[in-house]
Amino acid sequence: MGAAARLSAPRALVLWAALGAAAHIGPAPDPEDWWSYKDNLQGNFVPGPPFWGLVNAAWSLCAVGKRQSPVDVELKRVLYDPFLPPLRLSTGGEKLRGTLYNTGRHVSFLPAPRPVVNVSGGPLLYSHRLSELRLLFGARDGAGSEHQINHQGFSAEVQLIHFNQELYGNFSAASRGPNGLAILSLFVNVASTSNPFLSRLLNRDTITRISYKNDAYFLQDLSLELLFPESFGFITYQGSLSTPPCSETVTWILIDRALNITSLQMHSLRLLSQNPPSQIFQSLSGNSRPLQPLAHRALRGNRDPRHPERRCRGPNYRLHVDGVPHGR
């Protein structure tokens, strides 16, 4: 059955009417960039998540895919895998630098070509190169992450998006092939303290430079390892990109210990606009795709569920940075 056939009659009528109206209002939208998290932007129809797989044939997996993301992780379904090695981060001993963007959909950090930052270990069979750091957050606390744990959301989610540099030459090619992508997700709560890496991104001097869509600000001397908790476990599953084209070539790795940012930092994020300054303000918050069915996919974790109260200790529960366990 085709994707369009899966629509209810009312939704189909809304879609076709909106497409007809869009054809008569201004220039035609770029089909590769015509999507949003909300169906209506400034009175104009822009395809939201229910329509992603219907407006572009290349995005059909968004509607008919069977391994879509994000998902709700029920901890009782997580299979303990004692053979999962620790995660490894390679920076060549250099500090990270790059550009922080307001894309109109996300807060996005794009690393400079050098140094090359790679992640390996855990469930990954190959080394994956960092392509983007993406921050998603909600309009209210506790409801901003894409993934959930036991039906519980978080205020924000940081996604480190990587491509398999051993099999593919770039992100685009990797997104179309098996074992192509790896995304590390870290959940974020609002608290009285703040993660040191996120503090660099969210301090007043930085965040006010990206108030509007297409604003950008260059950052340097960043220590990516400071983004990670001192010790943590992880849960992994096979899924997809959570934005069009929803390619099902992603190994997701969810860090099981949340980070913190302050309420002031979260408020600053919610003041970012998804529009340029010439248009009406619309908060960048709420930039997440709805949950997708997990179905029969396996969830694996490196922490023994028989000992949930025991803190994870030892080198297997630390990020290894350039070959050395990070933290005390």
UniProtKB/Swiss-Prot annotation:
GO molecular function terms attached to this record: hydro-lyase activity; zinc ion binding
Stretch forming the signal peptide: 1-23
Tissues and organs where the protein is expressed, per its UniProt entry: Expressed abundantly in the brain with moderate expression also present in spinal cord and thyroid.
Domain Alpha-carbonic anhydrase, residue spans: 33-303
Annotated region (Disordered), positions in chain: 299-328
Keyword Signal carried by entry: yes
Compositionally biased intervals (Basic and acidic residues): 319-328
Origin: domain of life: Eukaryota
Record InterPro entries: Alpha_CARP_X/XI (IPR041878), CA_dom (IPR001148), CA_dom_sf (IPR036398), Carbonic_anhydrase_a-class (IPR023561)
GO cellular component, one term: basolateral plasma membrane
Keywords: Glycoprotein, Secreted, Signal
Primary subcellular site in the record, as a coarse category: secreted
Compartments where found: Secreted
UniProt-annotated glycosylation sites, renumbered to this chain: 118, 170, 260
Function in brief: Does not have a catalytic activity.
Family under the similarity heading: Belongs to the alpha-carbonic anhydrase family.
Name this polypeptide is given: Carbonic anhydrase-related protein 11
Organism: Homo sapiens (Human)
